[in-house]
Amino acid sequence: GEAGALTVTLLVGVGKTATHEVVITRPGRPHEGEARPARIALVLQGDDADLATVHDIDAPFAVAAPATGDGHERFLRDLHHAGHEIVLMVPMEPENYPRVNPGPGTLLVSMSEGRIRGELTRMVREGEGVVAVANLLGSFATQDESFVTSVYRTLKGLGLPFLHLTPAPRAVCKPLASRMGVAYDEPDVALVDEARAKTTEPLEAAWTTAIAHAHKHGAAIVLVRVTPLSAPWLPSAVKAASAAGVTLVPLSGVIHHASPL
């Protein structure tokens, strides 16, 4: 068949009478050099004031939004009603807590498994349109296997993946996800420091890297921090991706998925 596709038809029956037909197919492989579809899933990180400065993006994008804090329920509801997928940023214990504090409702390593799972489940259920859970800080908590196990058991039960933002060097999240069968991803490209630069040149360079990654691997998850610099730059970035043959798609079409228990 085309590109080496193979189809085998088996006739099953009694004697010379066929009662069933089984068709087994193996899709062909792309020809050498054949272009694969390139996709970018754009995730914007910011609060409601930040997102209000984003205009004229003619493409889907997800929003990494905090799970707690003043007005978070309204913000999550507004995002969902606007058609945006949500990456729920759950505050987790960082190093040097409480001097460094991600905010109210922070999940702590000292909490029992029951409390961690209960609080996390409540946070997820408060928001509609949640397609993944991410860490808000959490450099200390993500190094603790018992803590991460509690989080992963909850996410596996909810059928949600974990999107790990800025992993700490000693974080156990990635290897533990593999052992527990939990869907795990990290942004392929994160435009955070670049979004705080003095000019858009670092943003342009990182976006070029994201486009190249999408072409090479078929897809890229790209996180962009919304700032006064990055917000007005985003529409031109989306147009540049389209001109380069990259389609922006919803995050749910790119991120790995977990199966509910």
Set out the residue ranges of the language-model regions:
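Hydrophobic faces of well-ordered beta-strands that scaffold small-molecule active sites
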Residues: 40-44, 61-65, 84-90, 131-135, ...
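C-terminal domain-boundary segment and adjacent tail
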Residues: 155-169, 174, 226-261
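Alpha-helical scaffold elements lining the catalytic groove of polysaccharide deacetylases
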Residues: 101-125, 142-147, 174-215
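Active-site beta->alpha N-cap acidic-glycine motif
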Residues: 25-104
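Active-site groove signature of glycoside hydrolases
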Residues: 121-140, 216-217, 223
